[in-house]
Amino acid sequence: MGLAMGEREEVAMTKHNLERFFPYHTNHYPQALREIKAGEKGSHWIWYIFPQIKGLGTSSRSVKFGIENADEAREYLAHPILGHDLREITSALLELKENDPVKVMGWEIDAVKLKSCMTLFAYVSEEGSVFHKVLEKFFGGEMDEATLDLLKK
């Protein structure tokens, strides 16, 4: 139940400047979803598809697309495009037979970013969410401590 490409860019944005994710997210999401469904990330889109809490990375993309706090993470999940797509691509991870995050994400650093993203959104979601399930499947249920530390500040 997603929006058509033209509709995706007309959705009203929110107080946390979620419009910074567009057009990057819109342009790369279909490819990202194909790669995840195939079980092998091969291109560079992680910052605006699986965002992390701001403060973990220092690259310009990590800073630009970093989520400020739990309130912004909730707003991201409530967004009709960003929240829908994050849940959809996260659910696609659960459908894979592979449970090694490095094999799926292609690089150790991207596996770490995935864990950080899942921790962020699990933190603001009810127990048993798709984010908790991905943490269980790929990381033995362990959350990212650095993400939790930043969320508690």
Spans of features found by a protein language model:
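Short, conserved active-site entrance elements at the starts or edges of catalytic domains
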Residues: T14-Q31
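Mid-chain, well-packed structural core segment of small domains
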Residues: E75-F121
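Hydrophobic/aromatic-rich, well-ordered segments within soluble, folded domains that form packed cores
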Residues: E35-A70
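Short helix-capping/linker segments at secondary-structure and domain boundaries
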Residues: G55-R61, A122-H132
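Amphipathic alpha-helical segments within well-ordered protein domains
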Residues: L33, R74, M118-T119, E136
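Short, Lys/Arg-enriched N-terminal segments with co-localized hydrophobic residues
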Residues: M1-A12
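Residue-level detector of well-ordered alpha-helical segments, enriched
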Residues: K41-Y48, D85, D110-C117, V130, ...
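Charged phosphate-binding loop/patch that engages nucleotide di/tri-phosphates or the phosphate backbone
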Residues: E126-K153
